[in-house]
Structure formats: C-alpha cells, structure tokens
Regions:
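Glycine-rich phosphate- or other oxyanion-binding loops that anchor nucleotides, phosphorylated ligands
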Residues: 1-162
Length: 162
C-alpha cells in the first residue's frame, strides 16, 4: 500500500480498521451507505501481533480504490479535480494509506458473516516525498506476512479457549 498520513513511512505496517469505499466491487454486495469495517477480533490480533513482533504499525482507515494511476498521476486523469479533492479530504480525515482490496473484502465478509481483517506493508508515501521528508521505499512484504501469520495463530488460540 502507499502511505497517506505523514507519520506512515515505507516499511511500516498498516492495519485497516475500515476502508473508504472508493471502488466498485463492494457496491455489488451492499449499498454505499453500509460501512466497510474490519472484524474487531481480527484487527486486535493484527495490532497485538505487530506490537509483539516489534514492527512500527499504524491502525486506522484506509482508502480503497480501483485505479492505481488515479493516485499516482491524478493530474493526467479527466476527473483530476475530483481525485485531488477527495485525496485531500481523506488526508484531512486521518486516512492512513491507500490500497485496492479491503473494502470489497470487508463488505463480502459482512455479508457472509465471517471474520476479516487486513494488514499491509507500506511501500512508500508520496505525501512525505512531496514534502521533502525521508521516504524509504520498501518492497519486502515479509513483515506484513509475519504479522498476519502471528495474528491467525492468536485467533486460533483464542477460539480454542472460547
């Protein structure tokens, strides 16, 4: 994913608590007014796993979109005014990162009554780059995978004790 909040750096982990539904798939499952939120138990397991493994993490809302280049080159798009204005609104609302999967997963999971959560490796943060701040670019997803695997272990253990 790409960081949006200035505190989010490449190499950090983002745990999504909810997703802005700026994509089309989730609309096939539920009206746009229905929120795309992660399961609380899964979210807590992801956060506790990131902490236990010693990773820098950020939990919060992510922006979920269909178009990769709308984020990275919005001025080239016919709807640039809309993309730029919404991007600014999401930042002002404290959105942590931009990605392309969580909204549909959270909505489908709500419909199916199953637990779902998501964690991401932050590749970089274009906002930090534009501000001239340190912006490490990281492509190694091992940390996000380790967090997810540890979270599943914790969920299995909790389910056994329930």
């Amino acid at each position: 994913c790409g960081g949006m909040d200035m505190d989010v750096k490449g190499g950090d982990i983002v745990v999504a608590t909810g997703a802005i539904r700026m994509e089309g798939t989730s609309r096939e499952y539920a009206p746009i007014e229905f929120p795309a939120v992660a399961d609380l138990d899964v979210t807590n397991a992801l956060v506790s796993s990131a902490k236990a493994l010693g990773y820098t993490y950020h939990a919060g809302v992510v922006q979920c979109k269909d178009a990769f280049y709308g984020q990275h080159e919005p001025k080239r798009m016919p709807v640039s005014y809309e993309l730029l204005n919404k991007w600014e609104a999401w930042k002002r609302m404290g959105c942590k990162a931009s990605e392309m999967e969580s909204a549909a997963l959270f909505i489908a999971a709500s419909h199916l009554r199953v637990r779902c959560g998501s964690d991401f490796l932050v590749v970089g943060n274009q906002e930090r780059q534009e501000a001239g701040l340190d912006n490490p670019i990281v492509h190694d997803t091992e940390a996000a995978i380790k967090v997810a695997v540890e979270a599943v272990r914790r969920l299995i253990q909790a389910d056994k004790q329930a």
